[in-house]
Regions:
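N-proximal low-complexity "stem/linker" segments adjacent to membrane-targeting elements
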Residues: 1-17, 26
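Conserved N-terminal catalytic core of the sugar/cofactor nucleotidyltransferase
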Residues: 2-6, 28, 32-108, 119, ...
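A generic "binding-loop/recognition-motif" signal
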Residues: 11, 22, 57, 81, ...
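Active-site metal-binding loops of divalent metal-dependent hydrolases
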Residues: 11, 109-111
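Conserved beta-strand termini and adjacent loop/short-helix elements that scaffold enzyme active sites
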Residues: 55, 78-80, 133, 239-242
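Catalytic-core segments of class I nucleotidyltransferases/pyrophosphorylases
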Residues: 103-105, 112, 118-125, 137-138, ...
Length: 266
């Protein structure tokens, strides 16, 4: 049974004043809530087990799901009403709700996209522990991958901060950033290593066998921190979609273009 987690617990501060009275998951685009759009789209690809985490105006989401007969059979709630746990902590808290034998598709509720989820499911084979959907687009923070698309680290191109469990990535003798070609060239002694820069989409596939590694993490943490601290001992890969189209509907101005985006994308 295909399963997914929809991150819907955020405060939605960039969508105020709408989110002063409702969770962002229930904000409508084209007359349909963001939560409904996400569930319905994934359901078209055969997903029938959903976990939705809630925090901000959590009861509204709980009631919304309970009022839909199909949702009430497919959707389980991971309640973070007492404390917002961020993406990693939210996934960790929900671990018991998933089938251990099937990857978990993770999707932010405020993202619209053109992903073929049958194709993306095929990218997560048994040997991968996680697959992150990435693209080449301008951003301030990039994930770093080797030529086999295995995760090596992270870089903030504004501050120059490097994060990685690999010392040769974190502490190179020199580093040359080529943003135009999405490369980071590192020198360690006489060895030159080229890493590839990709922007994370917020969509990823997660193997439940990674859950035990989360036990040493606090209750609250971002999922990217988990990936960056464990990628040297796990098999975390990036998957590039060249024609990827995403719209973050987390800001008021993005609502104005969302309907047009849906017309040409979904």
């Amino acid at each position: 049974m295909k399963q997914a987690m929809i991150f819907a617990a955020g405060l939605g501060t960039r969508l105020r004043p709408l989110t002063d009275t409702m969770p962002k998951a229930l904000v409508k685009v084209g007359g349909v809530t963001l939560l409904d759009r996400t569930i319905q789209r994934l359901h078209q690809y055969g997903y029938s087990r959903f976990v939705v985490n809630v925090h901000h105006f959590s009861q509204q989401i709980i009631d919304h799901i309970a009022q839909n007969d199909l949702y009430s059979r497919m959707v389980q709630i991971s309640d973070e009403s007492d404390e917002l746990l961020e993406t990693g902590g939210g996934l960790k808290k929900a671990a018991r709700l998933f089938d251990e034998g099937e990857p978990v598709l993770i999707h932010n509720v405020d993202i619209l996209d053109n992903v073929d989820y049958d194709w993306f499911r095929r990218q997560h084979l048994d040997e991968e522990d996680a697959v992150l959907l990435v693209s080449r687009r301008p951003t301030k923070r990039y994930l770093l991958f080797d030529n086999a698309m295995r995760l090596m680290g992270w870089v903030n191109i504004e501050t120059g901060e490097l994060r990685s469990p690999y010392d040769w990535v974190k502490n190179p003798d020199s580093a040359v950033l080529d943003v135009e070609n999405y490369h980071l060239n590192l020198m360690r002694g006489t060895t030159e290593i080229e890493l590839n820069l990709f922007a994370f989409s917020g969509i990823h596939s997660f193997s439940p066998r990674l859950f035990p590694l989360m036990n040493r993490f606090p209750d609250r943490f971002p999922i990217i921190d988990f990936y960056l601290q464990t990628c040297h001992r796990t098999r975390i890969y990036g998957c590039q979609k060249d024609d990827l189209r995403l719209l973050d509907v987390g800001k008021l101005d993005s609502l104005e273009v969302a309907e047009k985006f849906l017309t040409f994308t979904i």
